[in-house]
């Protein structure tokens, strides 16, 4: 990595392409405390790179370094010629239209094109488009591609070129490397303001968390799961190593995925996230059970026609999911079997900083990577009245994510988890309302019959649980009237139309 002053490592924001037991409860004083302990006033300063971080490929430096190098000329511009007026992102978009042969030729034209044409995400796209999941990761995506088509060709070292370019300055390309090799800063992991419970009854869970739509971390409810004892890498490789699972846009054998995850050094590592794992490998389905709190799963009335609802999740440190709201207005639980995960959650009425949903909610624009969000936007919430709910969920613990909550999850180490989305009486009306939206074709997910899911689900609920929907609608209307009366009382008090008499 080139020598850089810490102030120059301030990143540039980039746009993305669009039984009843005794209750033991540890809870913060309020969900959104007005002020927190001054835990983040002191910034550690700069960034700490991962121990295994390689040197910066090709010598790309942040643009600010140019101003500390009098007389230097940015070879990025001279090497691009008339294309220098284009942003780095646009240059890469154009190069993304090229095949491997043309990228290889272009890399020989100038120093600038050499760097752009060797940008790893370009080669990642080529590997996934052409080879799908049938590849052996070879240290880098470019090396992986070449090895697949020219197995006798040998790269030196880890598959990267030894050619270093001097005086190439680019915030965009430098940050791509930085996000791939940055350790999570301690202050990003320090805040833990979620409610944690152990041995809570189902009734208390519903009244304290599910009905008020409040996140909670559940401890001890995975005791007895065979998966907790069994699901090591060795076990999974032995039992399902040759089974293909969904990894990003491709299907990939688990043993090949582990080879990839061991060697991956990128800001957005591929994530194994498979909704059909139980059908593919019934033994995995038999080694975990739905925690008692989430067994009212009303989508079950649809049988095999229900939308995708459960996933096995495997990924290396740094992998995860950027900010999103779970599909179809469902709530979710996420059980960590091995590893640990950092969670950041915002309530439905608070859009996270750096996240820009479209008016209809069909699309969300957010930073390119999770690390980039922490670098650029985490501190923005420091003075917010409603601060995010944060925690680290460890092996054997379960996170409850209420419907409508924005959440981000990043693996702090290699992790294996099970997650399920569900609809209970507490959020059934929300789900039905969501499914009947005019743009359901764009919003509903996990099924091919998006436009008819509302009618199918409602009919099945009415047949299986007669009167349930009407009862819930009546309770909702009563609660709405009570809230309106409460607001009306205080409004009249504030406008002096209501007077106390003693």
From Swiss-Prot:
Keywords of this entry: Gibberellin signaling pathway, Iron, Metal-binding, Nucleus, Oxidoreductase
GO biological process: epigenetic regulation of gene expression; gibberellic acid mediated signaling pathway; gibberellin mediated signaling pathway; positive regulation of seed germination; regulation of photomorphogenesis; response to red light
Biased composition (Basic and acidic residues): 24-35
Binding site for Fe cation: 324, 326, 407
Gene3D superfamilies reported for this sequence: 1.20.1280.50, Cupin
Region (Disordered): 15-45
Entry EC number(s): 1.14.11.-
The family this protein is said to belong to: Belongs to the JARID1 histone demethylase family.
Name of the protein described by the UniProt record: Arginine-specific demethylase JMJ22
Annotated organism of origin: Arabidopsis thaliana
Gene: JMJ22
């Amino acid at each position: 990595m080139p020598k850089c002053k810490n102030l120059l490592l301030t990143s540039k924001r980039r746009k993305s392409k669009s039984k009843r037991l005794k209750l033991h409860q540890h809870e913060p004083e309020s969900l959104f405390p007005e002020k927190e302990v001054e835990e983040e006033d002191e910034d550690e300063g700069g960034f700490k790179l991962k121990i295994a971080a390689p040197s910066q490929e090709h010598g790309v430096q942040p643009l600010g370094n140019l101003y500390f190098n009098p007389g230097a000329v940015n070879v990025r511009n001279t090497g691009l010629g008339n294309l220098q007026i284009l942003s780095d992102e646009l240059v890469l978009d154009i190069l993304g239209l090229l095949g491997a042969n043309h990228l290889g030729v272009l890399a020989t034209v100038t120093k600038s094109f050499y760097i752009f044409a060797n940008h790893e995400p370009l080669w990642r796209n080529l590997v996934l488009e052409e080879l799908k999941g049938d590849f052996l990761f070879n240290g880098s995506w470019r090396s992986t591609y070449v090895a697949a088509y020219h197995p006798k060709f040998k790269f030196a070292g880890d598959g990267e070129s030894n050619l270093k370019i001097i005086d190439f300055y680019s915030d965009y390309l430098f940050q791509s490397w930085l996000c791939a090799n940055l350790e999570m800063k301690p202050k990003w992991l320090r805040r833990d303001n979620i409610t944690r419970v152990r041995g809570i009854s189902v009734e208390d869970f519903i009244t304290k968390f599910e009905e008020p739509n409040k996140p909670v971390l559940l401890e001890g409810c995975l005791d007895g799961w065979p998966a907790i004892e069994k699901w090591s890498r060795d076990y999974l490789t032995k039992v399902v190593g040759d089974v293909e699972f969904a990894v990003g846009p491709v299907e990939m054998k688990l043993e090949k995925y582990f080879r990839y995850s061991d060697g991956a050094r990128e800001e957005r590592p591929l994530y194994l996230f498979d909704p059909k794992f139980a059908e593919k490998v019934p033994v995995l389905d038999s080694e975990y059970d739905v925690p008692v709190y989430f067994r009212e799963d009303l989508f079950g009335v649809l049988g095999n026609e229900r939308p995708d609802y459960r996933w096995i999740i495997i990924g290396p440190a740094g992998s995860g999911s950027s900010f999103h709201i779970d599909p179809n207005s469902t709530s979710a639980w996420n059980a960590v079997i091995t590893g640990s995960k950092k969670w950041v959650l915002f309530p439905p009425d608070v859009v996270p900083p750096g996240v820009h949903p479209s008016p209809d909610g069909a699309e969300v624009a957010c930073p390119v990577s999770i690390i980039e969000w922490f670098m650029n936007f985490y501190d923005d919430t420091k003075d917010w009245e409603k601060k995010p709910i944060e925690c680290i969920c460890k092996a054997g613990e379960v996170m409850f994510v209420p419907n409508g909550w924005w959440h981000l999850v990043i693996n702090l180490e290699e992790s294996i988890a099970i997650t399920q989305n569900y609809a209970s009486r507490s959020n059934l009306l929300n789900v039905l309302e969501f499914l009947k939206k005019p743009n359901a074709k764009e919003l509903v997910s996990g099924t091919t019959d998006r436009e008819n899911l509302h009618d199918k689900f409602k009919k099945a609920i009415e047949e299986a649980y007669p009167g349930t929907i009407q009862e819930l609608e009546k309770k909702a209307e009563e609660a709405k009237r009570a809230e309106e009366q409460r607001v009306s009382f205080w409004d009249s008090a504030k406008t002096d139309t209501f007077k106390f008499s003693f």
